[in-house]
Amino acid sequence: MSNIDNKGTYNAITVSSVTSVSLDPPSLLVCINKTAGIHDSIEEGSSFCINLLNKNQEDISNLCSSFQEEGNRFEGDQWDLNRIPFLRDAQANIFCIVDKLISYHTHTIVIGHVTDSKSKDEINTLTYVDGKYE
């Protein structure tokens, strides 16, 4: 998941699950820990992108899941930073506007209204199962 906050700071995080909520309107949800660096940049009406990674992007998944590497996530040229930051070579990019935020104990449930998407023709999606990438 990636976004840009109202101060112009780029944020990205690896999420373990993205869930479809509705087809009409098209929407999905992710759950973000309240201690995550990206958490406070997520507001109703703000935009974000879900980047579904391909199998050769294991390194970016690890980078975006490491607190110690938070400042290094946007180095290099793999990101398109023109508007909402997204990974150029991802399997798919799903662009959303935050529709609703639900606080639940340690996490915030983020419901996003899908506004646009793009995907690669060849399916080569990175998955994480039983503690390892596949």
Regions found by a protein language model. Give the residues of each.
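Basic, polyanion-binding surface patches
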Residues: 1-134
